[in-house]
């Protein structure tokens, strides 16, 4: 009797631990889902930025085909590009690498690229360089600095989504427990005839009724 009782407790403990492990895995999966969604946004941002850079080079190219590039119009294009956007700074260089026009934050390129081991302003940024195409080769280059730093509000939104998913999983677990206890309360089914249960030797009411009819 004691051995059967011990087996029953071990069997029940294994089931409970297995269910808890599944619950933890589901909650971790919710966190992974939110983080993966955030990581997928960075390549999309880079792709959109490169498309924008190519469009800007098409607008700048006619202004650089003369011996003296139109610096004022190029500067106006760059100012519009960096005005209240995720583009921290933008610069146009000639084919020799000399700066023609620049707009945005006044941070040196050496500091922006962290060549000295220091990240300017603590930003997580990314550089994009797009050639300005001409008939006989590149007329110059356009350099953009993208701000890939996740804002506090965006990070908070990701955390809120993760917490909501976890809460939904816990609510699903609670609903399952309540339904199980409600539907099976006071009833014994055939699965309760398992040799691991203490009630295995007692007949199910359905069996009793069938025996009486016979």
Swiss-Prot record:
Keyword Repeat included in the entry's annotation: no
Keyword ATP-binding included in the entry's annotation: no
Organism: Escherichia coli (strain K12)
Database matches in InterPro entries: Uncharacterised_Smp (IPR019305)
Pfam families, A to Z: SMP_2
Phenotype on disruption: No visible phenotype.
Name of this protein: Probable inner membrane protein Smp
Entry keyword set: Cell inner membrane, Cell membrane, Membrane, Signal, Transmembrane, Transmembrane helix
Similarity section: Belongs to the Smp family.
Subcellular location: Cell inner membrane
């Amino acid at each position: 009797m004691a051995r059967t009782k011990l087996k029953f407790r071990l069997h029940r403990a294994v089931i409970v631990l297995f269910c808890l492990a599944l619950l933890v895995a589901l909650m971790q999966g919710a966190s992974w889902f939110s983080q993966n969604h955030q990581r997928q946004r960075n390549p999309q941002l880079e792709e959109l930025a490169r498309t924008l850079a190519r469009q800007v080079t098409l607008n700048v190219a006619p202004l650089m085909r003369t011996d003296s590039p139109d610096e004022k119009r190029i500067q106006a294009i760059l100012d519009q590009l960096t005005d209240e956007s995720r583009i921290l700074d933008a610069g146009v260089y000639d084919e020799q690498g000399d700066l023609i026009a620049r707009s945005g934050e006044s941070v040196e390129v050496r500091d922006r690229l962290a060549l000295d081991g220091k990240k300017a302003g603590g930003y997580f940024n990314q550089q994009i360089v797009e050639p300005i195409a001409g008939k006989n080769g590149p007329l110059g280059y356009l350099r953009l600095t993208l701000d890939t730093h996740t804002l506090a509000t965006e990070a908070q939104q990701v955390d809120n989504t993760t917490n909501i998913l976890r809460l939904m999983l816990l609510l699903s677990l609670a609903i399952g427990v309540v339904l199980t206890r409600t539907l099976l309360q006071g009833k014994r089914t055939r699965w309760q005839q398992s040799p691991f249960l203490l009630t295995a030797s007692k007949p199910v009411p359905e069996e009793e009724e069938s025996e009486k009819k016979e």
